Amino acid sequence: MSTEQQTKASEVSVREPNAPWLKNYGDIPFHLEYFKGSMWGKVEQIIAQYPDYIAYDFMGKHTSYRKFGRDVELCARALKAIGVRPGDRITICMPNCPQTVVVFYAVNVVGAIANMVHPLSSENEIEFFLRESGSICAITLDQFYHKFEAIRQNVELSNVILASIK
C-alpha cells in the first residue's frame, strides 16, 4: 500500500475536509486498495493460488476452488453453445445455492449481464423483470419451472434452463 493509502483516520487533516467521520475510524485505514480486474479475474487468481482450498460448503459438501472453476468454465461454454453473447441479459431466478454462484460467474465469463430475480417472486413479477431487463434466457431451478411455463408465451426467451439441487 502507498503511504497515502495507509493513512489512518487518526491522521486526518485538511486533505479530507468533507469527511468529518473519518476521525472516528481509529487505526482503521480509510483508503482501501481494490482489485483492478473483473470479478471473474479475481476468482481466477484465487483458483490459481489456492486450487485445493474450499470455495464453498453447501449442506456439508465442500467444493474446492479448482472444481468451482471447472464448473464455471463448463457452464460458460454451454451458455455460449446456445448462443449467449457478450451484452446479452440472462435472468437467474434461483435461491442461494452453488448452482446460482456457478451460473452467475459463467454469465460473467461470457460477458453477458446477470439479471438476478428472487425465485419466490410471483409470476407477474418475474414476467415484469424479464420484460424490463430484455433477458433472452432464464435459468431457474426445476421446482420453479411452473412460473416460467405460465408466462413463457408472454415473453421473448430463447431458452429456459433448469437446474436442480442434488
Question: Whereabouts are the PLM-identified features?
Answer:
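Structural core segment of the AMP-binding/adenylate-forming
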Residues: 2-9, 109-166
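AMP-dependent adenylate-forming
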Residues: 16-19, 41-64
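Conserved AMP-binding/adenylate-forming core of the ANL superfamily
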Residues: 35, 52-97, 101-105, 122-127
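Short polybasic/polar patches that bind polyanions
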Residues: 48, 80, 108, 131
